[in-house]
């Protein structure tokens, strides 16, 4: 299973790659404003890495209810499935952007936000959560 983690946004789309051993690695974010260019680059990333599954962050609120961007993400998920013919797995993205941003030194955050680094780190967290659920580590032998 080769996965592409996606943190969807209207300005930037964060990406991460998951390999066969269950490790997520951030990729450069798609920051081009032109949607056609973004779709082309997304298709190139899927083809280059021979992706078999797409893992998309889904906006839930802290109380577990669906977030206000859910309809937009639902439409994006449907478009992904139609365009690439791959399964799309939705994963709770609650607090991933905050966690990704907090992993960057405070003095560097301002310039980094527009670069897409936070978005790709968030995609990495989303994907790693999926991979950890799909392939849990073996239980320790307590004998």
PLM features per residue range, with description:
Residues 1-6, 10-143:
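Phosphate- and other anionic-substrate recognition elements at nucleic-acid/protein interfaces
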């Amino acid at each position: 299973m080769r996965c592409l983690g996606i943190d969807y946004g209207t300005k930037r789309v964060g990406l991460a790659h998951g390999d066969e051993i269950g490790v997520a690695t951030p990729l450069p974010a798609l920051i081009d404003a032109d949607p056609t260019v973004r779709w082309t680059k997304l298709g190139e990333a899927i083809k280059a890495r021979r992706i078999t599954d797409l893992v998309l962050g889904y906006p839930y609120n802290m109380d577990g209810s669906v977030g206000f961007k859910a309809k937009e993400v639902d439409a994006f998920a449907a478009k992904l499935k139609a365009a690439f013919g791959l399964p799309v797995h939705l994963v709770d993205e609650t607090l991933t952007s905050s966690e990704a941003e907090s992993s960057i030194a405070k003095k560097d955050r301002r310039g980094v936000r527009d670069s897409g680094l936070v978005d790709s780190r968030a995609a990495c967290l989303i994907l790693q959560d999926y991979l950890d659920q799909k392939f849990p580590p073996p239980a320790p032998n307590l004998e």
